[in-house]
Amino acid sequence: MDPNCSCATRDSCACASSCKCKECKCTSCKKSCCSCCPAGCTKCAQGCICKGASDKCSCCA
């Protein structure tokens, strides 16, 4: 169980330590969401890449 995820390892959760997912149900949380995405980002599951600022990333900019 990753401390930053609400799923158990048997659910194929592989979050990175920098990921702040609340509901990780994917195989690689690092690629499907990121802490820099603003709340309500509907594209957060399309491979975000953070770009520095806490509210900027490749899919929500």
From Swiss-Prot:
GO cellular component: cytoplasm; nucleus
Stretches the record annotates as Beta: 1-29
Ligand binding (a divalent metal cation 2): 7, 13, 15, 26
InterPro entries the record matches: Metalthion_dom_sf, Metalthion_dom_sf_vert, Metalthion_vert, Metalthion_vert_metal_BS
Binding locations of a divalent metal cation 4: 33-34, 44, 48
Keyword entries, A-Z: Acetylation, Cadmium, Copper, Metal-binding, Metal-thiolate cluster, Zinc
Superkingdom of the organism of origin: Eukaryota
Binding site for a divalent metal cation 6: 37, 41, 44, 60
Protein name per its UniProtKB record: Metallothionein-2D
Complexes and interactors: Monomer.
Function: Metallothioneins have a high content of cysteine residues that bind various heavy metals; these proteins are transcriptionally regulated by both heavy metals and glucocorticoids.
GO terms under biological process: cellular response to cadmium ion; cellular response to copper ion; cellular response to zinc ion; detoxification of copper ion; intracellular zinc ion homeostasis; negative regulation of growth
Positions that bind a divalent metal cation 7: 50, 57, 59-60
Family affiliation: Belongs to the metallothionein superfamily. Type 1 family.
UniProt: a divalent metal cation 3 binding residues: 15, 19, 24, 29
Residues with the N-acetylmethionine modification: 1
